[in-house]
């Protein structure tokens, strides 16, 4: 006959130590430069005094998207 399936056992988190919190706060306090492309663009726009491009803006140039533009030529066949 079939046996009842065991329910997954939930594990409890270990108790948080004050030393762990201090170490995490110290890591956050370090001045690590942000390497995000979005952050770079925002910083450049802020320094030049212009507004950063937005996907919600009505003034789109078309360069804001990461998708490839379709080529002007006719589609090529995969068979030849």
UniProtKB/Swiss-Prot annotation:
Keyword Zinc, does the record have it? no
**Mind telling me which Pfam families this protein's record contains?**
Mustang
Instruction: Indicate where this protein is primarily found.
Output: nucleus
Give the matching InterPro entries: MUSTN1
Record's GO cellular component terms: nucleus
Q: Which residue intervals are annotated with compositional bias (Polar residues) in the record?
A: 50-62
Localisation per UniProt entry? Nucleus
Q: Which GO terms describe its biological process?
A: chondrocyte differentiation; chondrocyte proliferation; tissue regeneration
Ranges for region Disordered: 1-27, 50-80
Motif Nuclear localization signal located where? 8-16
Thylakoid among keywords: no
Null allele outcome, as annotated, is: Morpholino knockdown in embryonic craniofacial and dorsal axial tissues results in head and body axis defects with abnormal head chondrogenesis, small or absent eyes, reduced body axis length and tail kinks.
Could you tell me the keywords of this UniProt record? Chondrogenesis, Nucleus
What family does this belong to?
Belongs to the MUSTN1 family.
- Quote the function comment for this protein: Required for craniofacial chondrogenesis.
* UniProt name for this protein: Musculoskeletal embryonic nuclear protein 1
What organism is the protein native to? Xenopus laevis (African clawed frog)
Gene transcribed to yield this protein: mustn1
